[in-house]
C-alpha cells in the first residue's frame, strides 16, 4: 500500500555529549557521549511511524555501515525508504551537540549533507512521488529549488503541505512560500526572525496577538509557535480558531527532539481531521513523551497518542 504521507528531509548523525553536572562552557565537563541517528526529516518520519502513520521518506544517506544502519532502523519502523539514495560521501549531515545537566541544548555545530543529491531525486522522481501520496511534509530549508519545486508539485496535484523549519535561511529569502502550506510550525526564536521582533513567551495573549496579526497580514492558512516550557500558541485563519496550549510538566532527559515530535503529533492529528487546538494538544503530548528519553525520537511510546 502506498504511503499516505511523504517526508522530504535530511538525515544527520548526531554526536551528543550529556553533562553529568553543571555545564561549564570554558572548562572540562564529565558526562557521556553518544552517537545517535538524527536529522529533522528523519526524526519526523520516525515520529510519525511511531504513532501509526504510513510514511515514505525522501532523503539521502552515506553508502557506509552507518548509512545502512540508519536505513535498517527506518525499515524496521515500517517506513518506506525506496526514495532514500546512498551516496559515496556527504549523504548525511553531522551535528555536534552539548546537552547541559538539565538535558537542554547548550551548544552545537552542524554540517549539512550535500543537498544536490536530494535535488536530483526531486528533479527525477519528485512528480511521481508527490502525485502518489496524500500529504507532504517538507523540511523547508533544504534549498530554494527543492522547496519551491515540491510546493509547486503539491499545488498541481492538490496535496496538502505541512512545513517544518531547518535553519530559516530559505524561508527568509522566500517568505511567500509559507502561504502554500496547510500549517506552518516553528519555535519562538524562528518566529522572532520571521516577524522581526521578539516573541513574548511569558505573555501568551500578547504572543497570540502577534501571531494572528502576522498570519492575517501575510495570508497564511494556519501557524503554531512553540515556546518551550511556556507552551504554544496557535491560529487557524480559515476557521478563526486560536488559543494557547500549556506544556506538560516532564522530567527532561534530552530536549533536542521536542520540536520534531511536537510537529509530528500535531500534523498527524490534523491529517486525521482534528481541529488545530486539539491537534496541538496531541503534539504537546508526543513532545512530552519524547524528551523523557536520551534520543530525538521515542519509538516505543508509553501509550496510544490517539
Predicted regions, residues:
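Structural alpha-helical scaffold elements that stabilize or flank donor/cofactor-binding regions
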Residues: 128-129, 176-177, 216
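Conserved phosphate-binding/catalytic region of the ribokinase-like
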Residues: 1-6, 29, 170, 202-306
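Conserved phosphate-binding/catalytic loop of the ribokinase/pfkB sugar-kinase fold
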Residues: 86-87, 97-135, 140
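Beta-strand->loop->alpha-helix junctions that form or flank phosphate-binding loops
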Residues: 58-63, 82-92, 166, 224-227
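Glycine-rich phosphate/adenosyl-contacting loop at the front of the ribokinase-like
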Residues: 1-79, 95, 251-252
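Conserved beta-alpha-beta core of the PfkB/ribokinase-like small-molecule kinase fold
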Residues: 135-209, 230-231
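Short, conserved phosphate/pyrophosphate- and ester-handling motifs at nucleotide-, phospho-/glycolipid
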Residues: 48, 187, 259
Amino acid at each position: 500500500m502506498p504511503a499516505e504521507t511523504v517526508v522530504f528531509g535530511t538525515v544527520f548523525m548526531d554526536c551528543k555529549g550529556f553533562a553529568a553536572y553543571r555545564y561549564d562552557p570554558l572548562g572540562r565537563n564529565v558526562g557521556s557521549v553518544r552517537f545517535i541517528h538524527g536529522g529533522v526529516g528523519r526524526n519526523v518520519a520516525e515520529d510519525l511511524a511511531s504513532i501509526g502513520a504510513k510514511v515514505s521518506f525522501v532523503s539521502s544517506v552515506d553508502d557506509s555501515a552507518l548509512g545502512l544502519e540508519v536505513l535498517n532502523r527506518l525499515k524496521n519502523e515500517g517506513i518506506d525508504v525506496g526514495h532514500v539514495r546512498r551516496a559515496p560521501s556527504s549523504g548525511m549531515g553531522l551535528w555536534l551537540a552539548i546537552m547541559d545537566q538539565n538535558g537542554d541544548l547548550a551548544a552545537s555545530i552542524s554540517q549539512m549533507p550535500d543537498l544536490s543529491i536530494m535535488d536530483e531525486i526531486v528533479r527525477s522522481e519528485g512528480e511521481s512521488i508527490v502525485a502518489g501520496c496524500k500529504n507532504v511534509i517538507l523540511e523547508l530549508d533544504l534549498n530554494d529549488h527543492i522547496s519551491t519545486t515540491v510546493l509547486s508539485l503539491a499545488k498541481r496535484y492538490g496535496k496538502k503541505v505541512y512545513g517544518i523549519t531547518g535553519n530559516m535561511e530559505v524561508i527568509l529569502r522566500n517568505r511567500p512560500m509559507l502561504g502554500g502550506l496547510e500549517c506552518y510550525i516553528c519555535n519562538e526564536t524562528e518566529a522572532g526572525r520571521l516577524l522581526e521582533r521578539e516573541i513574548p513567551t511569558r505573555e501568551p495573549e500578547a504572543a497570540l496577538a502577534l501571531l494572528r496579526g502576522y498570519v492575517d497580514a501575510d495570508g497564511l492558512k494556519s501557524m503554531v509557535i512553540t515556546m518551550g516550557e511556556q507552551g504554544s500558541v496557535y491560529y487557524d485563519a480559515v476557521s478563526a480558531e486560536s488559543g494557547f496550549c500549556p506544556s506538560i510538566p516532564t522530567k527532561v532527559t534530552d530536549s533536542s527532539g521536542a520540536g520534531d515530535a511536537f510537529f509530528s503529533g500535531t500534523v498527524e492529528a490534523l491529517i486525521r481531521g482534528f481541529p488545530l487546538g486539539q491537534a496541538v494538544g496531541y503534539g504537546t503530548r508526543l513532545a512530552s513523551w519524547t524528551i523523557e528519553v536520551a534520543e530525538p525520537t521515542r519509538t516505543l511510546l508509553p501509550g496510544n497518542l490517539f
